[in-house]
Amino acid sequence: MSFVVAIDGPAAAGKGTLSRLIAKRYGFHHLDTGLTYRAAAKALIDAGLPLDDEAVAEKTARQVDLSGLDRAVLSAHAIGEAASKIAVMPAVRRALVEAQRAFALKEPGTVLDGRDIGTVVCPDAAVKLYVTASPEVRAKRRYDEIVTGGGTADYTTIFEDVKKRDTRDMGRADSPLRPAEDAHLLDTSEMSIEAAFQAAKTLIDVALNKTI
């Protein structure tokens, strides 16, 4: 049976970086579930299909190849906006959750990060983490990431976008963003990624020892 680490949290909280570090440390497979929605959105855009037709979006979502998710390509702002539109569709979420659950069965273990892993996708995960940080800190991280990459950004715009995404994610009727009752909270507002990794590693090691 696969060992699953579920990592949830709002945008720019550091869950993606933490997930990749954990996957590398333990030799687990990693899936950023947000990219699955972006991949479905990109496929719709590329095919010139509407973003407001749930049946079409569901069919497209079922054809997403989870092994070919290119973060660099899928990080485009336009794709993110399109992904937000189809992510609220229950049929699309069901289709992608099925694919995500199938991915979670991979041996020897998997790390899935997103918004509803511990609550919906993998409620029986061995370890559940909820990674968060203040909106101000998350906006600053996103701003620094863009500027460091050579882009231009406005902090106020990013901050408002972060708050808007939080409201949308937490207020969604289908699979809203919230910590699982048995999730371990990691607030990275004033915590380095290394400290967050060590905290997660301690929890994972304890859980792994229980499975031996």
From Swiss-Prot:
Q: Which CDD domains match?
A: CMPK (cd02020)
> What GO biological process terms does the UniProt entry carry, in alphabetical order?
pyrimidine nucleotide metabolic process
Q: Where in the cell is it found?
A: Cytoplasm
A Pfam family recorded for this sequence = Cytidylate_kin
Binding-site list for ATP: 9-17
Fetch the InterPro entries from UniProt.
Cytidylate_kin (IPR003136), Cytidylate_kinase_dom (IPR011994), P-loop_NTPase (IPR027417)
Task: Report the superkingdom from the record.
Answer: Bacteria
A GO cellular-component term linked to this record: cytoplasm
Major enzyme class = transferase
The reply on keyword Transferase is yes
Task: Tell me the protein family, please.
Answer: Belongs to the cytidylate kinase family. Type 1 subfamily.
The molecule here is called Cytidylate kinase
What is the organism field in this record? Sinorhizobium medicae (strain WSM419) (Ensifer medicae)
| Gene giving rise to this polypeptide | cmk
